[in-house]
Amino acid sequence: MLIQADDETLLECLVMNADPEHDADFYEFDLKTVTEYRKKMLSAPVKDGKAVLEELTGQRKEEAEDDDLDWEEEVLGEMEGGEPNDRFANYWNDDTGMTYPLILAKIPVKNPWEIFAYLPFGNWNECPDTPDLMAVAKYWFEQHGAIPAAMSHDELEFELPTPISKERAMEVAVEQYGFCPDLDQNEDGSIGSLADVLWQSTVWYFWWD
């Protein structure tokens, strides 16, 4: 897992989830408490990732209805205008053209979705909590071979061995929009244009506001 080494907000998020008593002074986290949290997450049954995504997508549809948006025409749109994405983005500094300081972390897990028990960065705004992150990551790994590979405090990127099929691209794009409604991977912001990215790409990018 690639992690931004100087991202204090990421450290704050990790401590907030694993040792909430020390979230105000996250450099003083209690190792025993963090270890117990990790064990708890790893020992719990993993939720049904497909069901989690269906619930989140249902929330997005309700939000669209509340905003008087037509789901098919204004949210889904046409599958067009996408560009391939085969490069991680979150650790690049646009001002310098170089990467931020990085940690290449070897996480001692048997399964890739268990990474979030060690790095519980979510559970704020629309970013899912650890059980949901683990469930969705398990489902996407089993379906597509997707592995969590790069992280900052508000970004997450998965790497795939090969792009998904064009036939499944819209289905997966809807799942990703449910998972991350702040997706900003394309010019018009429609799920269709995201789908046109996915069938050409081996990197999935997520960003939460």
Language-model-detected regions and their locations in the chain:
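Extended, low-hydrophobicity segments enriched in charged/polar residues
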Residues: M1-P112
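Exposed alpha-helical structural elements
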Residues: T33, N111-E114, D132, R168-E171, ...
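Surface-exposed, low-hydrophobicity interaction/linker segments
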Residues: Y91-Y139
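A generic structural signal for short, non-catalytic loop/turn and secondary-structure boundary residues
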Residues: D95-Y100, F141, M151, V197-S201
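Short edge beta-strands and adjacent turn/loop segments
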Residues: I107, A146-A150
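Tryptophan-centered motif/residue detector
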Residues: W124, W140, W204-W208
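Short amphipathic beta-strand starts and helix->beta connectors
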Residues: Y139-A146
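Alpha-helical oligomerization segments
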Residues: P148, D154-D209
